[in-house]
C-alpha cells in the first residue's frame, strides 16, 4: 500500500511534459496497433482483391507485408540517425513532422492498389516510427531530475501498453461499424496518428523538474 501511495504521489508531482508526451504516445501506439493488426489484410484487399485468408493472393499479400515491414525498419533507422543530429530546440517540430508524415502514410494505404507504391507508404510510416522511438524518452528524461528517474520511466511504459489494449478493444466496435474492411482501419489509424501530431503542440519542454 505504501508503494502504491508513493507511485500515486510521484504521478501527482510528475512534470507536465510527462503527461503531454504520454498523451501523444497514446495516439501513436493506438495507431500502430492497427497497422500491425490489419496490414496484411488491407494489402490483400487493395492489391490482390481478396479477403480469403486461405487464398494464394492473401498469402502473397502477407509476404509483401514482410518486405514492407523491412522497408519501414530501414527508413526508421536512417531517419533516427538524422533526428539524432537535430538541435534540441527543434525537437517538437521534428516530432510533429514525423507523426504527420506517418499519418499521411497510413491514409495512403487505404487508397493505394499498387504493391510497389506501398513502399512509399511504409517509408513514411517508418519516419513516424523513428520519431516515436527517438523523441518521447528524450523529452521525458530531460524534464526529470535524477531523483526517481527509473520509477518514472517504468510508469511511462504504461503509455505503450495501455493504448494498444484500448485499440484492440475498440476494434470490436469499429471494425464491423466500418464495414469489416481492413483497409478502412488505416483511415482510423491515420486520423489517430494525426491527433498525436497535433498533440505535440501541447508539449512544453523543461529540464530537471
Q: For each of these PLM feature ranges, what is it?
A:
Residues 101-113:
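C-terminal ends and interior cores of transmembrane alpha-helices
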Residues 146-178:
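A late C-terminal transmembrane helix in Major Facilitator Superfamily
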Residues 49-73, 184:
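Loop-to-transmembrane helix entry
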Residues 1-23:
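Juxtamembrane intracellular "pre-TM" segments in multi-pass secondary transporters
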Residues 78-91, 175:
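Helix-to-loop junctions at the C-terminal end of transmembrane segments
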